[in-house]
Swiss-Prot record:
Tissue: Expressed by the venom gland.
Protein name: Acidic phospholipase A2 Cvv-E6h
EC number of the protein: 3.1.1.4
UniProt cofactor(s): Ca(2+)
InterPro entries: PLipase_A2, PLipase_A2_Asp_AS, PLipase_A2_dom, PLipase_A2_dom_sf, PLipase_A2_His_AS
Lineage, top ranks: Eukaryota, Metazoa, Chordata, Craniata, Vertebrata
A Pfam family it matches: Phospholip_A2_1
Keywords: Calcium, Disulfide bond, Hemostasis impairing toxin, Hydrolase, Lipid degradation, Lipid metabolism, Metal-binding, Platelet aggregation inhibiting toxin, Secreted, Signal, Toxin
Subcellular location: Secreted
Function: Snake venom phospholipase A2 (PLA2) that shows very low inhibition of ADP-induced platelet aggregation in platelet-rich plasma of human, rabbit and guinea pig. In vivo, shows efficient edema-inducing activities in rat paws. PLA2 catalyzes the calcium-dependent hydrolysis of the 2-acyl groups in 3-sn-phosphoglycerides.
Signal peptide positions (record): 1-16
Recorded family membership: Belongs to the phospholipase A2 family. Group II subfamily. D49 sub-subfamily.
Reactions listed under catalytic activity: a 1,2-diacyl-sn-glycero-3-phosphocholine + H2O = a 1-acyl-sn-glycero-3-phosphocholine + a fatty acid + H(+)
Length: 138
């Protein structure tokens, strides 16, 4: 059900950050964020709670925290400008909100790439009832 919700949200806004985030993950990690990370662990997907289960789930936890620090904007819908140079994402907006959201997405995409070796299929479609621990602060 959580995966279907993510698909619906992604299809609603063609220009929003969630679609751009999917594109960045594909460019940097070489994987579809929707297929690999939309329902992984306690934090990858819509919402998050408990403790991150591994390094990949921690990427999502940090991304959630980063979005939470984006002030005066909606990180899930704002569009930003970026380029790819030598395999690296360069966030190009002068607007503080757009730049911050782009940086959140860039850091998460790099984190996913760097943690591909530790990706654990046991955390795919991880039951929410396994994420009941007290969350750590951002």
């Amino acid at each position: 059900m959580r995966t279907l919700w993510i698909v619906a949200v992604l299809l609603l806004g063609v220009e929003g950050s969630l679609v751009q985030f999917e594109t960045l993950i594909m460019k940097i990690a070489g994987r579809s964020g929707l297929l690999w990370y939309s329902a992984y662990g306690c934090y990858c997907g819509w919402g998050g709670h408990g403790l991150p289960q591994d390094a990949t789930d921690r990427c999502c936890f940090v991304h959630d925290c980063c979005y939470g620090k984006a002030t005066d904007c909606n990180p899930k819908t704002v569009s930003y400008t970026y380029s790819v140079k030598n395999g690296e994402i360069i966030c190009e907006d002068d607007d503080p909100c757009k730049r911050q959201v782009c940086e959140c997405d860039r850091v998460a995409a790099v984190c996913f790439r760097d943690n591909i070796p530790s990706y654990n299929n046991n955390y795919k479609r991880f039951p929410a009832e396994n994420c009941r621990e007290e969350p750590e602060p951002c």
